[in-house]
C-alpha cells in the first residue's frame, strides 16, 4: 500500500506542477486563497493530503486557517491547522504552525491529536509554491508523541 500511496502522490504532484492559477473561490462565505497537495510522513506511514487556505484575522493577528483531508495506509485524516508568517529569508516564508486532527484509523478507530511546529514555503512562480512543515504531535488516545513531515505544492487563485 505504501508504494501505491507514494506513486499516487508523485503523480498528483507532477500533475499539479502543470496547473495554472485559477479564479478566487468563496465557500460558505469564506475566501479561499489557494489549494495545496502534499505527502505527509508520520512515523513511517505516508498519506496523500489535499488542503486549502483561508486567511482570517484572529484577535487582530493575520493567520491562515488550513483545513486538509488525507488518505494513506487505510487511514483517513481530517486536519485543521493555522499558520502565522514569522519572517522571510532569501525569498522563503518561515511560519509557525499549529493544529488539531481527527484520524479514522483503519476505518474502525478514531484518534485525536494536536500538533505544533514550523514551516517554510518558497514561491516558484505563476502562483505556485513548494512547502514543507515539520510538527511534533501528541495523540490523546494512544497517549504518545510523534513527528510529522509534510512536503507539497500549493496553487494561488
Enumerate the predicted regions with their spans:
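Outer-membrane beta-barrel proteins
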Residues: 2-157
Amino acid at each position: 500500500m505504501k508504494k501505491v500511496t507514494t506513486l499516487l502522490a508523485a503523480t498528483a504532484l507532477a500533475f499539479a506542477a502543470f496547473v495554472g492559477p485559477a479564479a478566487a473561490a468563496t465557500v460558505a462565505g469564506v475566501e479561499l486563497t489557494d489549494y495545496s497537495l502534499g505527502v505527509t510522513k508520520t512515523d513511517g506511514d505516508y498519506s496523500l493530503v489535499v488542503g486549502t487556505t483561508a486567511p482570517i484575522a484572529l484577535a487582530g493577528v493575520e493567520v491562515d486557517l488550513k483545513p486538509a483531508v488525507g488518505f494513506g495506509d487505510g487511514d483517513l485524516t481530517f486536519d485543521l491547522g493555522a499558520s502565522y508568517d514569522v519572517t522571510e529569508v532569501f525569498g522563503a516564508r518561515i511560519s509557525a504552525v499549529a493544529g488539531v486532527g481527527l484520524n479514522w484509523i483503519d476505518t474502525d478507530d478514531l484518534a485525536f491529536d494536536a500538533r505544533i511546529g514550523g514551516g517554510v514555503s518558497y514561491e516558484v512562480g505563476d502562483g505556485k509554491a513548494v512547502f514543507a512543515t515539520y510538527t511534533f504531535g501528541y495523540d490523546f488516545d494512544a497517549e504518545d508523541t510523534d513527528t510529522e513531515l509534510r512536503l507539497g505544492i500549493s496553487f494561488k487563485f
